Curated annotation (Swiss-Prot):
Gene Ontology biological process terms in this record: enterobacterial common antigen biosynthetic process
UniProt protein name: Probable ECA polymerase
Membrane-topology annotation of the record: Multi-pass membrane protein
Keywords: Cell inner membrane, Cell membrane, Membrane, Transmembrane, Transmembrane helix
Subunit structure: Probably part of a complex composed of WzxE, WzyE and WzzE.
Amino acid sequence: MSLMQFSGLLVVWLLSTLFIATLTWFEFRRVRFNFNVFFSLLFLLTFFFGFPLTSVLVFRFDVGVAPPEILLQALLSAACFYAVYYVTYKTRLRKRVTDVPRKPLFTMNRVETHLTWVMLMGIALVSVGIFFMHNGFLLFRLHSYSQIFSSEVSGVALKRFFYFFIPAMLVIYFLRQDSKAWLFFLVSTVAFGLLTYMIVGGTRANIIIAFAIFLFIGIIRGWISLWMLVAAGVLGIVGMFWLALKRYGLNVSGDEAFYTFLYLTRDTFSPWENLALLLQNYDNIDFQGLAPIVRDFYVFIPSWLWPGRPGIVLNSANYFTWEVLNNHSGLAISPTLIGSLVVMGGALFIPLGAVAVGLIIKWFDWLYELGNRETNRYKAAILHSFCFGAIFNMIVLAREGLDSFVSRVVFFLVIFGACLLVAKLLFWLFDCAGLVHQRAKPQPQTQVEG
């Protein structure tokens, strides 16, 4: 890459970043937080944060990358995607009405809410316990990270239930919403994340999500300022780099440490070059249509329920890894949101996907606003826990693609909804048995004048 080509890419990157950052800043000033703000920051991180890292790798360490014209296409496609997404998100097809009372779809009481978070936490802890009994601490047993996907590890499906610990802790926080509950959320979820990191063998998702939710709650409540958020972000990047070194068993120093930091940070937070690789091999892609979305549900179907279930699921990530990169190491490499759309239907699917994502984020913001307006604090805690608990799925959306997001958000909805239904059933049984008692309201103290 010549300096002239880099200069052209830099101009496009600066304009695109300024465009998205400006819209995000205006939205932040207006509402302080909603899921449009979160997705916009996540989109910036995924598709634009990595450009400076790539530039240093190219000019400092002479690392090979895709041709400049392909990198330009990747930057422009990301900017155009966001423009279509933003217009979709902001467009209203009918007048907003907030004063018309509507019959609530469901309601919650104190006992049902506590039963819900206990079951969510129980699902996570029991799954971790069973996985640990089968495999022990994989971080200290396995020699390479790719081994966690091998036949040496049993009970892999249980990992999908670990994440429900976070929504359980979110319910506890939203019932109190004070600084002590906020700090308790951080300590409990990060401790659980570190435990699963050691048990699973290097998976950092629970730690990243817990820390991100903690920061956004702090922003919403005014406990964290913007400069503190930036400082925490830098600390998070360094922390994730250290965990990555431990995960891959790397011992580096000097220039090698700087090089390792650059490419691991880029791959962890901003795999934008994967989109460029897909665009570089565009003519060789056999478009998969909507099949990757359907196939991604296969992993949630137990083999005893479907004996003939395919052992290999060809979703967009695996198609990118196996067919485009010809990588059969056992790891699935993230194609990114836009990359998954390219795999499914080429350039035509990019604006269609942007419209779909705009509607998805709008739906989450509708739920979030519903929780903000809710007068029943127990129902509000459940709604907010569901919305913030789905942040993990939004990160999957940006990094892994639309197919992975759809299957995971449906799975999350089913398990979360099942816990709500079971909680209501248990409350009904307890109530029928006379085990539920109303809390006595404290009597007002009367002051006796002497």
